[in-house]
Amino acid sequence: MRKRGLQVHARVRPVLNIGIVVGVLLGGVVLLQPFYLIQEGQVALITQFGEIIKTNNTAGLYVRAPFLHHVHKYTAKLLRVDGDPQKIPTKEKQFIEVDTTSRWRIEDVKKFYQSLGTYEAAYSRISDIIDSSVRDIITVNGLDDVVRSTNAINESNHSEQFDVPVSQLAFDRGAEKTAHMTIEKGRESLAREISQAANDQLKDFGIVVVDVIFKGIKYSDELQASVFNRMVKERNQIAQMFRSTGEGKKAEWLGKLDNEKRSLLSKAYEEAERIKGEADARAAAVYAQSYGKSPEFYGFWKSLEVYKKSLPDTEKILSTDLEYFKHLYQH
């Protein structure tokens, strides 16, 4: 039995030795990490004793020399950095609060590694440079160029709504007509200038700014009050123009109605006179016919008509013996 046990133990020992060797090798692989992985959208930079020996931007699994080669990975995708809101005076010395955001990417990974090395350093440097560029560009341009991108507000023909050319607008209350300033560049053009100014300073860092976007522009309290007052003034002018146009339309329609009224009254008067003439002619014919048949009755009838017209307005006391009343008291 003892001899058989020694034989089994002799066969197990080589297996254990092999397992130990394999375990040591696997542990060495894990500890030394001779492999590195480049994912899509990444750039790898390999250094040896601090010196750059190569770069690689192709996705895949690669081998390096442990302890000798160090792998630094960076993204090739767009990154974003938000600037700090800052109060800046425009060319007119009107203070506004400007807040921007920017998109950037690593253009030259070697320059980036040698000059900055980390994202934290890159964010800090980019933010400082862009904030400085924003200040430089804003201070030499007018407020209208900062807040507007086109002259569309000037080119729009408001007279289409009012049937009155804008150049002929007049206001009864002496209000001054406000005009929008014509911009020379516009906000989008200023954003491109800021990007270009920032790129001129960042080219030595292997960084390129893709674009700068104005997230927000806030007026100071004084400027905001001035803008609101101008808006109210413009709205009042448009309202006054509406009223003036309405009054003009009203006068035009009243004139037409008055002319139509006069025309209708004239036609009605002519028709009434015609009918009256016909009636008088017929009455005269009837009177003539009646007179021919009974002159005495005709005289009596005409006297009654005279009494009816004259007596109600007579305030004097008249005698019944007068010739005037012969038809009343003689019969």
Swiss-Prot record:
The keyword Membrane applies. GO terms for cellular component: membrane. It is found in: Membrane. Gene3D superfamilies: Band 7 domain (3.30.479.30). It is a single-pass membrane protein. Its main location: membrane. The keyword Transmembrane applies. Keywords: Membrane, Transmembrane, Transmembrane helix. InterPro entries: Band_7 (IPR001107), Band_7/SPFH_dom_sf (IPR036013), HflC (IPR010200). The chain crosses the membrane at residues 18-38. NCBIfam families: hflC. Belongs to the band 7/mec-2 family. HflC subfamily. HflC and HflK may interact to form a multimeric complex. PANTHER family: MODULATOR OF FTSH PROTEASE HFLC (PTHR42911:SF1). HflC and HflK could regulate a protease. This is Protein HflC. It comes from Treponema pallidum (strain Nichols). The lineage of its organism: Bacteria, Pseudomonadati, Spirochaetota, Spirochaetia, Spirochaetales.
